[in-house]
UniProtKB/Swiss-Prot annotation:
Gene source species: Entamoeba histolytica (strain ATCC 30459 / HM-1:IMSS / ABRM)
Membrane-spanning segments: 1228-1248
Residues bearing glycans: N200, N331, N384, N462, N652, N883, N1197, N1207
Keyword Lyase: no
Subcellular location: Cell membrane
Topological type in the membrane: Single-pass type I membrane protein
Listed name of the protein: Galactose/N-acetyl-D-galactosamine lectin heavy subunit 2
Length: 1286
């Protein structure tokens, strides 16, 4: 049992992604177990420190399966540990399970991998006091951040990374995306239960482990050159020689400007062999492509079944791979081993693109991790060489670990099922004798068969039994008499609940249509007196009233303290504590007064809460909120009496039901100006209505356009009509308004076009339209409406990446190309083009380009290299800032990418030598051709040459072998008729050709160019008297701190074409320069706020020097705040500006306000001048705020505004003092709020309905500030309650 992972483990069918589970087992897996619909309890043993799932009500999926191997006295034995609660054995038989033939305990068909979830300690507070506590099922649990796919995990123990322990239970898991799994109560489990459970349900099953059965070829790319780890790697890679199905190994490594390969036997994969290969520095992309092609050819030729590639690398790749299309579909498995000392995300990102499965990726940072990393590599390769999935036979799908899996969790209404790993389909379980969930006996009607999702259905009717229409069904008086003649009856069920018309109906079969139709009904359903009653139909279609029956739901099923009750207010069933008959009725406390947890000994107990006011339903008490204060009253009704705006709930004592009364506003007087027009014109537009419990006069229509004018209500509540048509101008066209009579004796203000105007509707409307490019009639057409003086527009979709120029939409990206030039081997410039595409409304260079394509863009280059394209490496360079995720999600690229995208899109071409053949200029130096270097040597000197390891050497079978690379020729002399053969020095060497090659290459590179740095880094070296290859010495290309090349720096690489050291131009990136010059200029590399530029100068002696200066235009040295209510600083890590909101507290800025008064206000920064202003809270979902006449804050329950949530404070006025002057003197809306509140506090009196004025002013202030894009609203009651708790 100790193998059940000490980390947080969970199995949940719904949590799986399709490709994340398998129905097979092998000893390379972490572990696997079965699943069911219903997650069970979690048990954690403190004594043995292991986790156990205990499944409840899960048939037959109550199984754990995990595998392991043990070596005893030199014998390796692999077995499965199985927990199986549905088997045919007794406890005694479990001890002898190996020797039992007929047993269904050790089944493998129902096995799925467990999932491992972990706490994200990096995001857990180090201070235990900061860890949030949560009540879950009556238990106090603690919230911890968790790694994907979880968002949070809740444990019953409070701990930090420093104090973490294994002694915890899991309460709940929250998944990213919103799904949660809550674990059931498990207070009664103990060690005895666990021991008994293990004894009866757990056993060890011996298995035959799947042997490796896939023959493969191993391609190893040596791309790690770090001297501190290379020896350990070479020693540890010998472990791969234990792979039993590998038929050969090919080593690939960079060598100079080219590469080298060598084929070795698997047994020679050891340190003594690998030490012979010295890998060059650089990106291994070309080697990956070459190895991929080599392996794919072996697969195509049926020499191997699968290719295996191991990529050792310590540099980011120069290009991006698609693992699925480039490797998986070609049956090649790629495994990466990455040395990433500084955890560079760019290296990780590019290396991950090579693999399609997490276990195939291995990253380490130091020499101490080499052994563990290569062991994991070995396990990953070995697991992948066992094939249990044939794509031609698997009806499910082959997952990433090459196993046939079922497309979903197996569920069937008729049989217990499992996943058949051979076919990937769900089959009855177990195979030998399937267990049926439902039996379907034969009757006189016919033969029945159980079908998934349907149940028992007739598969074959007996004679005269098949129904004539859908609504008839055959039956027999005696089901056991299979010879009885069938009878037919209507298959129409009567109502169990009343229909929508309020009656209970029975139904009969309409033999014409085949559908059921209404037949008879009983009495009308009446008599419900509470929400917890419901209407039910009996067999005689009589409607009766019954009390609702509630049933406990998960996770409360096993909790004895909880019962299912109907809520009288809502009519909904709830899981509530059995002793809880209390409901809140005002007061300071709104929580429950009852508990059932460890503090009450897991018994249901209720205690009065201080300052709480609760009504007891067992005493027929309800809460009456309709008076001045909420109070409990004994009532015949069961619902609380509340006020809701203009409605008041009352109790009918006779019927024992509640009803609503409306506030009557029919007698409210509406006043009009006595001018003979106002009442006639405006009366239809105003009426009296109830608002916030008061009768007010409100407009009920659009009063801004009444007849030829408008209506308005003055401060004296008198309504007046204003005729202003003649002074109006149309919104579009600026036409004069004219009052015209309508056919119904009414009048309208119209705006006819000037008869003298020759402008069309499109011309008129384009001038007042807010659309982009309004005058482009291809995409915008208009119609002028004289009744409103406005225009209606018809808009067509505009082209992508278009802008408005001279009134027309112009497609900016259409047919755009970047013109590029490149100088090729003949010294001529060739032009090529890189097309640009519109992607997500951005015009960017095409993301993929074939730089050797035979098309209009690269045609000239294609023709030039056509004779020998096999030796040309064409690379498309693209900006490293390109975000592939944004591209796939149809999101725009960053501004930084757009700035450099065009500049960073170009092609490079490089000629390489393979097997002593290369691409070279012809004698005319106008074309290139394929040449065999060894054939040239033979032709020129008459001495036979052969190719070995990409170098030309004199044929080993030639009689006159060279001495110290000096070429000798055969001389035949004759004396006395006897011929004598001797060797004579020719004065030539095997180095001559390569020496000339170096000389010509440097000459061609330097010719016609000035100011080129020339540091030679390659020469010929005589090897074994015969071979004379070009050897690069990269040490010469390491930047010397004493040498200043100006704004250029050595890259540490030797150019394989020119045999000179490569230089990089220094412009704005000091990280490319040596530390000596960075320190000399005071460069801060870790400060992203500072950007630099390289400045070059020339001394009187002609010597060029350089230094780094801060580029003030690009640097973010002194960021500015966007408004007066924030400060701005630069983040030195990202270089981004950080804006911090200015904060203020009510108690500090307004010390004269008491806590009770301050409960309604929060302190806010003014966007006008940055000063602090007092602002009243707006309404929230839970709370509503106002002030009494003394300025005291009143917080009301939003759903019941008669219920005050804070302490009530009596207001006693000394007298009425008019405070209008203080308000009138205020200059801004925000200051009005301050003036009103301060006046209330200092004078200790209030204005009538002052809180309405304050609230209105506050809302206006927020409306104004919302126009500022950087405005962020407060958290309403949360912020204020934290400051004032009085």
């Amino acid at each position: 049992m100790k193998l059940l992972l000490l980390n947080i483990l969970l199995l949940c069918c719904l949590a799986d992604k399709l490709n994340e589970f398998s129905a097979d087992i092998d000893y390379y897996d972490l572990g696997i177990m079965s699943r069911g619909k219903n997650a069970g309890s979690w048990y954690h043993s403190y004594t043995h420190q292991y986790d156990v799932f205990y499944y409840l009500a899960m048939q037959p999926w109550r199984h754990f399966v995990w595998t392991t191997c043990e070596t005893t006295k030199g014998n390796k034995e692999c077995y499965k540990y199985i927990i199986n609660e549905d088997h045919n054995l007794n406890a005694q038989q479990l001890n002898n399970i190996k020797n039992l033939d007929k047993q269904d305990f050790c089944q493998k068909e129902y096995a799925y991998p467990i999932e491992k979830y972990e706490v994200d300690w990096d995001n857990v507070p180090v201070d235990e006091q900061q860890i949030e506590s949560v009540d879950i099922n009556g238990k106090t649990c603690f919230k911890y951040a968790a790694k994907r796919p979880l968002a949070y995990v809740y444990l019953n123990t409070k701990m930090t990374y420093a104090t973490k322990t294994e002694a915890y239970d899991v309460c709940r898991m929250d998944f990213i995306g919103g799904r949660s799994i809550t674990f059931r109560s498990f207070n009664n489990e103990n060690k005895d239960f666990i021991d008994q459970y293990n004894t009866n349900t757990t056993s060890k099953c011996i298995i035959d482990v799947h042997k490796n059965n896939v023959n493969t070829h191993l391609a190893i790319i040596l791309g790690i050159t770090d001297s501190t780890v290379i020896k350990s790697l070479q020693e540890k890679l010998s472990v791969l020689s234990q792979l039993t199905t590998v038929d050969g190994v090919t080593i690939y490594y960079l060598k100079g400007d080219s590469y080298a390969t060598d084929n070795i036997k698997l047994k020679d994969l050891k340190y003594e062999t690998l030490v012979k290969y010295t890998a060059g520095q650089g990106q291994v992309d070309p080697l990956v492509n070459i190895a991929k092609n080599d392996l794919f050819k072996m697969i195509s030729d049926k020499k191997i079944k699968r290719g295996t590639m191991v990529v050792l690398m310590d540099n980011a790749l120069g290009s991006e791979f698609n693992a699925e299309t480039e490797f998986d579909r070609k049956n090649i498995s790629v495994h990466t081993v990455v040395l990433n000392r500084n955890k560079d995300s760019k290296i990780t990102y590019s290396a991950l693109k090579l693999v399609s499965l997490g276990p195939h990726y291995h990253e380490f940072t130091s020499n101490s991790e080499v052994s563990t990393t290569i062991d994991e590599l070995f396990k990953g390769i070995r697991a992948n060489l066992t094939e249990r999935c044939d794509r031609d036979k698997c009806s499910g799908f082959c997952d990433a670990m090459n196993r046939c899996t079922c497309p979903m969790c197996c569920e069937n209404d008729c049989f217990y099922t499992s996943c058949d790993v051979e076919t990937g389909s769900c089959i009855p379980w177990p195979k030998a004798k399937p267990k049926a969930k439902k039996e379907c006996p034969a009757t006189c009607v016919g033969l029945y068969e159980c079908k998934d999702l349907e149940g028992c259905v007739v598969t074959k009717y007996n004679a005269s039994c098949e129904p004539k229409v859908k609504c008839m069904v055959p039956y027999c008086d005696d089901d056991n008499n299979l010879k009885e003649v069938c009878k037919q009856k209507a298959n129409c069920e009567a109502d169990q609940k009343p229909s929508s018309d309020g009656y209970c109906w029975s139904y009969t079969c309409d033999e014409t249509t085949g559908f059921c139709k209404k037949y008879k009904h009983g009495n009308l359903c009446t008599g419900k007196t509470t929400n917890c009653q419901e209407y039910v139909c009996d067999s005689e279609q009589r409607c009766t009233v019954q009390e609702k029956v509630c049933v406990k739901t998960s996770p409360y099923i096993e909790m004895s303290c909880y019962v299912a009750k109907c809520n009288l207010n809502t009519g909904m069933c709830e899981n509530r504590l059995s002793c809880d008959t209390y409901s809140s009725c005002g007061g300071d406390s709104t929580g429950s007064v009852c508990k059932c947890d460890a503090s009450t000994g897991n018994q249901c107990k209720c205690n009065k809460v201080e300052n709480g006011n609760y009504c007891d339903s067992s005493k027929h008490e309800i809460c009456d909120y309709t008076g001045d204060k909420p109070k409990c009253i004994v009532s015949e009704c069961t619902e609380d009496l509340v006020r809701d705006g203009c409605l008041i709930k009352r109790c009918n004592k006779t019927s024992k039901t509640t009803y609503w009364e409306n506030v009557d506003c029919s007698n409210t007087k509406i006043e009009f100006a006595q001018d003979g027009k106002s009442e006639t014109m405006c009366k239809p537009y105003y009426s009296a209505t109830c608002l916030n419990g008061q009768c007010v006069v409100q407009a009920v229509g659009d009063v801004s356009n009444v007849g030829c004018g408008y209506c308005s209500m003055g401060t004296d509540n008198v309504i007046t009509y204003h005729d202003d048509c003649d002074s109006r101008k149309s919104q579009c066209g600026n036409f004069n308004g004219k009052c015209q009579p309508n056919g119904d004796n009414s009048y309208s203000c119209v705006f006819e076009k000037d008869k003298t105007s020759s402008k069309s509707d499109n011309d008129i409307c384009a001038e007042c339209s807010s659309l982009t490019c309004p005058a482009d009639t291809t995409y915008r057409t208009y119609t002028y409406d004289s009744k409103t003086g406005t225009c209606k527009a018809t808009v067509k979709p505009t082209p992508s990446c278009s802008v408005c120029e001279k009134g027309k939409f112009v497609e900016k990206c259409k047919d755009q190309k970047l013109e590029r030039k490149v100088t090729l081997e003949d010294g001529k410039e060739y032009q090529y083009n890189i097309p640009k595409d519109c992607v997500n409304e951005q015009c960017i260079p095409r993301t993929y380009v074939d730089c050797l394509a035979n098309d209009d863009n690269f045609g000239e280059i294609y023709k030039f290299y056509l004779p020998c394209q096999a030796y040309v490496t064409a690379t498309y360079h693209y900006s490293s800032l390109f975000n592939l995720t944004s591209y796939k999600l149809h999101l725009p690229q960053s501004e930084e990418f757009m700035k450099e995208a065009d500049k960073e899109a170009y092609c490079t071409y490089e000629i390489t030598t393979r097997e002593c053949k290369t691409c070279s200029l012809t004698e005319t130096k106008e074309k290139v051709e394929e040449i065999d270097l060894c054939a040239e040597e033979t032709k020129n000197g008459g001495v036979p040459f052969k190719c070995k390891n990409n170098n030309c050497i004199i044929d080993p079978n030639f009689d006159c072998q060279p001495i110290e690379c000096k070429i000798q020729e055969i001389v035949i002399t004759e004396k006395d008729g006897i011929k004598t053969t001797t060797c004579k020095d020719t004065g030539k060497t095997t180095c001559d050709t390569n020496n000339k090659r170096i000389e010509d290459a440097r000459k061609a590179f330097i010719e016609g160019k000035e100011g080129i740095e020339q540091v030679e880094c390659a020469s010929t070296v005589c090897q074994n008297d015969n071979s004379c290859p070009i050897i690069a010495d990269v040490e010469k290309c390491n930047q010397n701190t004493e040498v200043d090349y100006g704004c250029k720096a050595m890259t540490g690489e030797c150019d394989g074409t020119t045999y000179l050291c490569k230089f990089v131009q220094l412009t704005d990136d000091p990280s490319l320069d040596s530390e000596h010059f960075r320190t000399k200029s005071g460069v801060e590399l870790n400060n992203a706020c500072l950007k630099y530029k390289c400045v070059e100068s020339k001394g009187s002696d002609g010597k060029i020097t350089h230094k780094w200066e801060i580029d003030t235009e690009r640097s973010n040295i002194d960021p500015k705040p966007r408004n007066p209510c924030e400060t701005a600083t630069c983040d030195q890590t990202t270089g981004e500006t950080i804006y911090t909101k200015k904060t203020c507290t009510v108690s500090e800025e307004f010390p004269t306000i008491t806590p009770n008064q301050g409960r309604c206000f929060y302190c806010q920064c003014s966007y006008l001048d940055g000063s602090s202003v007092l602002t009243m809270y707006g309404e929230t979902d839970k709370e509503y705020y106002d002030l009494d006449a003394c300025g005291n804050c009143r917080v009301w329950n939003q759903t019941d505004r008669t219920q005050q949530l804070n302490n009530h404070t009596e207001c006693i006025l000394a007298g009425e003092i008019n405070n209008v002057g203080a308000i009138a003197a205020a200059t801004t809306v925000a200051v009005v709020v301050v003036a009103v509140v301060v006046a209330l506090i200092v004078v200790s009196i209030g204005l009538f309905k002052t809180y309405q004025l304050v609230s209105s002013a506050m809302k206006n202030a927020i409306t104004t500030t919302n126009e500022n894009a950087e405005y962020v609203g407060a958290d309403n009651e949360a912020t204020n309650a934290a400051t004032y708790n009085g």
